[in-house]
Amino acid sequence: MAATAEVGVTATLGAAARAVATRQGLLNDPYAEPLLGAVGIDYLTRAIADHTFAADESPVGDDPAVTSLLDALAAHTRFVDEFLAEAGRAGIRQVVILASGLDTRPYRLWWPRGTTVYEIDRPRVLDFKAGVLRGLDARLATNRCAVGIDLRDDWPAALRRVGFDAAQPTAWVAEQLLVGYLKPAEQNRLLRRLTAASAAGSRLAADHLPTWDPLQLEAERAFVEGWRRRGLDIDLASLTHPGEYHYVPEYLATHGWEPAARSIADLLGALGLGPRRRAGSGGAQFIPEYVTATRV
């Protein structure tokens, strides 16, 4: 039985994207494929093992519901990996990954000595990942601290209890989190809490949706049905919450940050994927924007 109920859909798809990108030489995540296998989505594990995602001529490889999403997730992973490397070179030794899912950055990346990575997610997600990695005899590359808590709860207090120091600059990562997963009020609260816990010089990397297309919900329904046919049961209501969201770079700029934004085309181009694959489907476009910001 698939374990998506334990780890979540976005975590599962993120692992699939990293597994594909690793086989293509775009990333180096040796744990993505075994983690995905442990989740147990036959369609994904079979397609990756057969290299079907990487082949343009294959029926699966041409499916925009698969390739466009996995390309975007892989591009974002590379974007965040590079962001963290730059933060380390700048002297930041405290990292917080919000909703870390099945990513394994504390194991797979190089870190400057003295770095602590705090991974926040629901306890069952962290427990699932830890169990699989123990079975793989995975070795940490830096200090790691798992913080099992829902981001709707008081996660800053949970961070402080395990040694997080808000007086020191932090590198924050918010992947697939500011794209409608939280309700508008919840997203604003998360950004307020993050800002309050950020000393001068802290940095943030995140993705968000700059606009909400009126056709977006229709496209998402089609997206969900496509993945259900492949064995991945997605609850659309738990994934996105349509509403009036702040434009994230603008919100950050008015709350003590200096933001910069990049397009999905920029990130895909950096991976050499170019225009041959397009994010979105049908008449609506699911086109995220990628934000970095520095606390002033």
Swiss-Prot record:
Gene Ontology terms: biological process: methylation
Residues given in the record as S-adenosyl-L-methionine binding sites: 121, 150-151
Key words of the record: Methyltransferase, S-adenosyl-L-methionine, Transferase
Segments traversing the membrane: none
Keyword field contains Methyltransferase: yes
EC number, as in UniProt: 2.1.1.-
Pfam families: LCM
GO function terms (MF aspect): methyltransferase activity
Role description: Exhibits S-adenosyl-L-methionine-dependent methyltransferase activity.
Family that this chain belongs to: Belongs to the UPF0677 family.
Name of the featured protein: Putative S-adenosyl-L-methionine-dependent methyltransferase MAV_4764
Species, as recorded: Mycobacterium avium (strain 104)
